Each structure stands twice: as structure tokens, then as C-alpha cells.
Curated annotation (Swiss-Prot):
Membrane-spanning parts: none
Protein known as: Serine/threonine-protein phosphatase PP2A catalytic subunit 1
Keywords, sorted A to Z: Hydrolase, Manganese, Metal-binding, Methylation, Protein phosphatase
Modified residues (Leucine methyl ester): L315
A molecular-function term among this protein's GO annotations: metal ion binding
Family per record: Belongs to the PPP phosphatase family. PP-2A subfamily.
Enzymatic reactions: O-phospho-L-seryl-[protein] + H2O = L-seryl-[protein] + phosphate; O-phospho-L-threonyl-[protein] + H2O = L-threonyl-[protein] + phosphate
Residue numbers annotated as active site: H123 (proton donor)
Lineage: Eukaryota, Sar, Alveolata, Ciliophora, Intramacronucleata
Residues the record lists as binding Mn(2+) 2: D90, N122, H172, H247
Organism expressing this protein natively: Paramecium tetraurelia
EC number of the protein: 3.1.3.16
Cofactor note: Binds 2 manganese ions per subunit.
Bias kind Basic and acidic residues: ranges: 298-315
Residues reported in the UniProt entry to bind Mn(2+) 1: D62, H64, D90
């Protein structure tokens, strides 16, 4: 992950001020967003489609614009650069502060590029986030679509997957019938909108199936479902031990299936401010032992009490 894109002392001061500004609940100016996106693309374009990551680190799932809960996550998991982070995508949409959320994520990436990995989720795509809230939020907060276009350009540079210590395969969604070897991911051109089918699509859209083996048609309309037998074959063929992914709301914030070899991590508590779920982050130590930490939503004024319920199917 080493890069020649080192920050000057002046740039460090500027980005630190931006991080402080965001944590105080203020949005960046259009010019600040433009400069941030340019610098972020310079850093991200040096990263391969598969990031090789060292432990210890903390793995986090979907955030979905829940900015206050992201701040809570860092309070619980530790601030950068003291803690290394791997985020599995879906930073925007659904929540009301996707602008602040992705601005902070990019600012942290620029400031501590070797301490945080940002993978792409299925919502880091124009076709999706123009429908599910990010576009409208950008327009509402800036009065035009310029900032949205700048952010969506960055989405194309986000890596597609990571492997922790050559043993834990990480992607937003999961596996693909088009992938026998993880090396196939290296050949993809990721700087594009997410295709409607194929390996790149499946990495960001697929879901594990608990009760059936083999491949199945996904109810999402993109990606596939895959069974325990597929997980076992994939891990054996690629000399891996586990799969860590996000993409699905799970009420406890974490779910382990396929003989605990496929782990779903979801890091947006009380998803959409109404689902009543817990969130979770997973710390992985040098011996690859996993320690999960579940947490509730950050306190908010005037927020109604929410009962725990499984919602209608979400993209």
C-alpha cells in the first residue's frame, strides 16, 4: 500500500482542520470537496483491486450515511492512526448524512492512507445512489450536483476486495460463479460504474445462503446466492480460511454461517433509524483471532424509541 503521495506539512494541517470541521457537524465547502477528491483519487489509483492487509485491524460493515454512528464506531474501536481499519463499503444512501460520512472517510484516507482501507460497496455507484438518497442529499446541501459528481468519480477508484494476512477474503457482497481464483479480480477494470452482471457485480452484490448448497438466483436482481459447499470449495482452492463481508442487515450486527467460515458484519445500528438492530465491528489480532464488539446507536436528541424488527428486503 506504499505510495509516493506524501502530504506536505501544510496539507496535513488543512486535512486535520477538515476532519475537525466534519466532526463538529459542518460540511466541507465545494472547493474543499474538489481538492479532497483529487487527492483521494491520486492515492486510490495506486491501490490494486485486491488489497493485501496486515493484522491487527478492525473490520467494519455498512455505514449508510449514519454519521453520528460512525463517530460512535471510532469512539468504540479507536481513532486513527492508533487503530487500523478495513471498511467493506456502503458509506452512502439511506442515512441522512452521507455527505458528512463519505467526506470524513475520504479525509481519513488522505490523512492516514496506510492505516485505513476503503472497499467499494454496491451503493458506491451512480445508478444506485441517485435513487437511494445520496444524490438528493448532495443537491440539498450544495444546491447543485457538482459535489455528487466529484464523489461518484472517486467511487470508481475504490478497491474491490482485500485479503487479511493471506487468509481472510473480504468483499462487500461475496463470491461469484465467474471466479475460481481470487487472481481473476486483479484483471478487472474497476474504474467504471458497476456492471449489471459478471465478477465485479457479484463481488458487490452476492449473498450467502444458509440452507441450500450451490448457486442460486438472488432476490436482489443482481449477484447470486451461494451455499456452504461453494464457500468450502472457494476457500480450499485459494488457500484461504474465511470470508468476511457486509451487504446484509443482520439484527445482532454479525452473523456467521457456513460452519462459521462466512461472516457478515453490519455496522449501521438502528438501520434507517427504524430497524432496531445492533451494529458490530470485528477486531482481528496478529494471530487472526476475532473479537466482535456490538454497539447501539449514538444518542440523538428527539429520536423516537425504536423496536427491533426485521425490515422489508433492502438493496
Amino acid at each position: 500500500m506504499a505510495s509516493l503521495n506524501k502530504l506536505s506539512s501544510n496539507e496535513i494541517g488543512n486535512i486535520d482542520r477538515q476532519i475537525a470541521k466534519l466532526k463538529q457537524g459542518q460540511i466541507l465547502s465545494e472547493q474543499e470537496v474538489k481538492s479532497l477528491c483529487i487527492k483521494a483519487k491520486e492515492i486510490l489509483q495506486d491501490e490494486p483491486n485486491i488489497i493485501q492487509v496486515r493484522a491487527p485491524l478492525t473490520i467494519c460493515g455498512d455505514i449508510h450515511g449514519q454519521f453520528h454512528d460512525l463517530i460512535e464506531l471510532f469512539q468504540i474501536g479507536g481513532n486513527l492512526p492508533d487503530t487500523n481499519y478495513l471498511f467493506l463499503g456502503d458509506y452512502v444512501d439511506r442515512g441522512s448524512q452521507s455527505v458528512e460520512t463519505f467526506s470524513l472517510m475520504l479525509s481519513l484516507k488522505v490523512r492516514y492512507k496506510d492505516r485505513i482501507v476503503l472497499l467499494r460497496g454496491n451503493h458506491e455507484n451512480r445508478e444506485i445512489n441517485k435513487i437511494y438518497g445520496f444524490y438528493d442529499e448532495c443537491f440539498r446541501k450544495y444546491g447543485n450536483e457538482i459535489v455528487w459528481k466529484q464523489f461518484t468519480e472517486v467511487f470508481g477508484y475504490l478497491p474491490l476486495s482485500a485479503i487479511v494476512e493471506q487468509q481472510i477474503f473480504c468483499a462487500h457482497g461475496g463470491l461469484s460463479p465467474a471466479m475460481e481464483s481470487v487472481d481473476q479480480i486483479k484483471q478487472l477494470n474497476r474504474v467504471q460504474d458497476i456492471p449489471h452482471e459478471g465478477l465485479m457485480c457479484d463481488l458487490l452484490w452476492s449473498d450467502p445462503e444458509e440452507t441450500k448448497n450451490g448457486w442460486g438466483i438472488s432476490p436482489r436482481g443482481a449477484g447470486w446466492t451461494w451455499g456452504c459447499d461453494i464457500t468450502e470449495k472457494f476457500l480450499h482452492s485459494n488457500k484461504l480460511k474465511q470470508i468476511a463481508r457486509a451487504h446484509q442487515l443482520v439484527m445482532e450486527g454479525i452473523q456467521k454461517v457456513h460452519n462459521q467460515k462466512t461472516i457478515t458484519i453490519f455496522s449501521a445500528p438502528n438501520y434507517c433509524y427504524r430497524c432496531g438492530n445492533q451494529a458490530c465491528i470485528v477486531e482481528v489480532d496478529e494471530q487472526l483471532k476475532m473479537n466482535q464488539t456490538q454497539f447501539e446507536p449514538a444518542p440523538r436528541e428527539n429520536e423516537p424509541h425504536t423496536t427491533r424488527r426485521v425490515p422489508d428486503y433492502f438493496l
